């Protein structure tokens, strides 16, 4: 940026701060989950989303729903699901009423790993937020995140 470049608008500054906060939180959680459970943030998120879907053992979603839930393209989601399926943490099966549909289901091993990883995720999230709260640029965003009362 040179002296003649226009200053970012408050909206752009806010977006940059939000992006910075997200990146720092995700990186901190990623390191913790990888070190203790050999899971990426995306893998953890997918197991978490599927664990909240209830249809008998574990949970299931169609692949498009999985992609939307973990905010990935369908091709990236397929690769993510394949990695977890190879580790026996997920299974895929055809939809019984629409043979074109493929469901993804979390396994008992996936639920067990998720239960072990959840405290690590929560602790890392708290640590990342506490660290970010010490940054004057990020502190207001941290307060907003902490004040949210989103239903589970």
Q: What residue spans do the PLM features occupy?
A:
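Solvent-exposed, charged/polar functional surfaces in cytosolic regulatory/catalytic domains
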Residues: 20, 24, 28, 32, ...
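A cross-family signal for key residues in well-ordered alpha-helices
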Residues: 48, 115, 142
